[in-house]
Swiss-Prot record:
Family: Belongs to the archaeal ATPase family.
Listed InterPro entries: AAA+_ATPase, ATPase_dom, MJ1010-like_2nd, P-loop_NTPase, WH-like_DNA-bd_sf
Protein name: Uncharacterized ATP-binding protein MJ1659
Top-level taxonomy: Archaea, Methanobacteriati, Methanobacteriota, Methanomada group, Methanococci
PANTHER family according to UniProt: ATPASE DOMAIN-CONTAINING PROTEIN, DNA-BINDING PROTEIN-RELATED
Swiss-Prot/TrEMBL keywords: ATP-binding, Nucleotide-binding
Organism of origin: Methanocaldococcus jannaschii (strain ATCC 43067 / DSM 2661 / JAL-1 / JCM 10045 / NBRC 100440)
GO MF annotations in UniProt: ATP binding; ATP hydrolysis activity
Matches recorded under Gene3D superfamilies: P-loop containing nucleotide triphosphate hydrolases, Winged helix-like DNA-binding domain superfamily/Winged helix DNA-binding domain
C-alpha cells in the first residue's frame, strides 16, 4: 500500500532545514516550489521524525484548510481557545506544555495546530482588530517557551491566502514586520512560511522591508535518480520507469498515482497517456475561455508557450500579464531567485507542446 503522498528520500532538504532549526533564529525562511512537490510532507516529516520534542515547541498553522476572507477568519485560524484557568495553568507548567494540550496536538507529530488563548482575549482581538495586541500576545507565549529552555517554531502553510487581507493596510506587511522582530531582532522564534504560489513569492521577493532578513528555499520535484529509486521500490521495471519519467517527470503526487494504478492492475503506459489527454483537455478549456474573454492576452499566452517547444525552462526579464495568467492557472511556475519560468509539471510541458502542434495544423 502506498500513502497519498508517501515520503521518500529528501535527505538534502532534511539536512539543510534541520541545520537551520539548530541555529539561533535569525531569518524568515520562505519554502516554495511547484504545486504538489512535497513541501508540506517534507516539513511534517522533519517535525515528526527529526526534531527533539524536549527541545522544540512547534506551532503549525495550515491556512490551506480554511476559507479566509477577512481579518477575523485569520485570527480564528491562528488561535485555539481555552478557559482562562487553563491558560494560567499553562503559564505555571510550561515544561509540560505538550502533554497538557491533548486536544490541540496531533499525537503522532506533537505539532500544535493553534496558539492557545483564553476566550475573552480572543474576543478582544476580534472586536478591536488591533494586530499589535495579537503580536504582543504571541511574543509573550514564545518568550515563555524560550524561558523554559525550549525553542519555538512557527510554521504557516499557504501564507499567500492572507496576502490581500487589509486592516489599516495589508495584514501581510504587518506580519512580515512581526516575523522580522521574532527572528532578526529578538532571535526568539524560527519562522517558516510555505507557499505553492510563486507569484506571491515573487511579490515577497521584491518587498524592500525583507531585504537581508529572509531566505528562500526551493523544494522541487524529484530528479531522475530519486524518481527511479522510488519507483524501483514499488517494483516498476526499467521500461515502466522510463514511461513514467517521460510523462510525469519527478512529480511526487503523480508517481504515487502511477504506483496505485499499477497495484490495481492497470497498464502504466495507458494510465500515463490518459493523464496527458485529461491535462491537455483542461488546458484547452482554459485557453478557449481566455480567447473568448481577451483575444490579445490569449495570443500573448500562446506566444509564451512557444518558448517551450524545444526547451523545458526559460529565463524571464519581468513578470508580464501573460506570465501572471499562466501562473495563476497553475500552468507555469516562477523560480524567483534564478529568474526561471517553467511548466508546473512534465505533464503540463507535454500538454503545451501538443496544443501548439494542433494550433499549427
Amino acid at each position: 500500500m502506498v500513502d497519498s503522498m508517501e515520503f521518500f528520500d529528501r535527505e538534502k532538504e532534511i539536512n539543510y532545514l534541520v541545520k537551520v532549526l539548530s541555529f539561533e533564529p535569525n531569518l524568515i525562511y520562505f519554502i516554495y516550489g511547484p504545486i504538489n512537490s512535497g513541501k508540506t510532507t517534507l516539513i511534517k516529516h522533519i517535525i515528526e521524525n527529526k526534531l527533539d520534542r524536549d527541545k522544540y515547541v512547534v506551532f503549525y498553522i495550515n491556512l490551506r484548510e480554511h476559507f479566509i476572507s477577512k481579518y477575523e477568519d485569520f485570527i480564528e485560524v491562528l488561535f485555539n481557545t481555552y478557559e482562562e484557568t487553563f491558560i494560567e495553568k499553562l503559564k505555571k507548567y510550561l515544561l509540560s506544555f505538550i502533554n497538557d494540550l491533548p486536544k490541540n496536538i496531533d499525537v503522532k507529530s506533537t505539532i500544535l495546530t493553534g496558539i492557545p488563548v483564553p476566550k475573552n482575549t480572543l474576543n478582544e482581538f476580534l472586536s478591536t482588530k488591533n494586530s499589535e495586541n495579537v503580536f504582543e500576545y504571541l511574543t509573550k507565549i514564545f518568550e515563555d517557551i524560550k524561558k523554559k529552555g525550549k525553542q519555538p517554531i512557527l510554521i504557516i502553510d499557504e501564507l499567500q491566502k492572507i496576502g490581500d487581507l487589509k486592516i489599516n493596510g495589508f495584514l501581510i506587511y504587518e506580519l512580515f514586520n512581526f516575523f522580522i522582530d521574532l527572528t532578526k531582532e529578538k532571535h526568539l522564534c524560527h519562522v517558516l512560511c510555505l507557499s505553492s504560489d510563486s507569484l506571491f513569492i515573487e511579490r515577497v521577493y521584491n518587498e524592500g522591508t525583507l531585504k537581508d532578513r529572509c531566505k528562500y528555499y526551493l523544494v522541487d520535484d524529484f530528479d531522475y535518480k530519486t524518481t527511479k529509486a522510488f519507483l524501483k521500490k514499488h517494483n516498476f521495471n526499467d521500461e515502466e520507469i522510463d514511461i513514467v519519467w517521460h510523462y510525469f517527470g519527478g512529480k511526487p503526487i503523480k508517481l504515487v498515482e502511477a504506483i496505485q494504478e499499477k497495484l490495481l492492475g492497470e497498464d502504466v503506459k495507458e494510465f500515463c497517456k490518459k493523464s496527458l489527454r485529461v491535462r491537455k483537455r483542461q488546458l484547452k478549456d482554459l485557453l478557449y475561455s481566455l480567447e473568448d474573454d481577451n483575444k490579445e492576452l490569449f495570443e500573448r499566452v500562446i506566444k509564451l508557450f512557444e518558448n517551450f517547444k524545444n526547451r523545458d525552462e526559460i529565463f524571464y526579464e519581468k513578470i508580464s500579464e501573460e506570465i501572471v495568467w499562466t501562473v495563476k492557472k497553475n500552468i507555469l511556475f516562477v523560480n524567483i531567485e534564478e529568474g526561471i519560468l517553467k511548466p508546473q509539471s512534465k505533464l503540463d510541458l507535454l500538454a503545451i507542446r501538443e496544443i501548439l502542434d494542433e494550433i499549427k495544423t
